[in-house]
Amino acid sequence: MKITTWNVNGLRAALRKGFSEHLQQIAPDVILLQEVRARPDQLPDGWAAPKDWHVTWHPAVKPGYAGTAVWSRRPHKVLARGLEDGIDDDEGRVLRVQTDDPQGKPVRVASVYLPSGSSSDARQQSKEAWMKRFAPFAEGLRRARTPTLIGGDLNIAHTERDLYYAKSNQKQSGFLPHEREWFGTLLDTGWHDLVREHASDVDGPYSWWSNRGQARAKDRGWRIDYLLGNAAAGKRFKSATTHRDAGLACSDHAPVSIDLY
């Protein structure tokens, strides 16, 4: 079973840049989208309910901003929107569903778009408040006996292997010491960073690149798009792939996939 996460940086723009063709090449059973930036009724004809997919959208209230979605080849059931703590998810940042693998066994996935704090101190404060709320949410998912995955743009590079220019970004949002510590705590509780487990101790594979300079062409990026698995998912983990070419073509993020036995 292949599960893919992709921050598309605006689905309408990605569709014009070859999203459909790259999706066919990747051929996931489930795709988790972030930064959709559109309501279904704003998409080109046929894309609100694309053929051969079961689709749930979770757009932001603010037009053209954030938003998540889950597409699956087999029917899925929506389990929740948001962090399930009584606070409205007006920015459409979390969508959680349950679907089945090809053998008919249940698998749970959450498409997550953690806020960025890079634009201002206020946005960083908002990000950190969101992180505090996310930790207990993630712990609840981790305990499930059903294979469960959190996939998405988490806007944090965990270690120096996850960021090309690590030394010069020590004080930048996304690589702050307390953000990295927070991420490490998630892993310490029992979440598996499946891409890192597959890549071992190599640098990257990066999943986001700045548009400045030659960062994209020279693969000088950040690894901030993750697929985290609980213990049940970790036992079934087979392999991981970062689709750099698709990222360069359609978005500033690469799609990232994992395969489960």
What are these regions (language model features)?
Residues 37-117:
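Structured beta-strand-rich core segments of catalytic domains in phosphoester-bond hydrolases
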Residues 6-7, 23-43, 109, 138-160, ...:
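Active-site beta-strand/loop signature of hydrolases that rely on acidic residues for catalysis
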Residues 73, 97-104, 219, 230-231, ...:
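Active-site beta-strand termini and strand-to-loop segments that position acidic
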Residues 84-85, 114-131, 167-171:
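Surface-exposed cleft-lining segments at the edges of enzyme active sites
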Residues 1-49, 54, 60-66, 158:
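N-terminal, active-site-proximal structural segment of metallo-dependent hydrolase catalytic domains
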Residues 51-54, 130-224:
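Metal-dependent phosphoesterases centered on the DNase I-like endonuclease/exonuclease/phosphatase
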Residues 1-9, 106-121, 151:
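Active-site-proximal beta-strand elements of phosphoester/diester hydrolases
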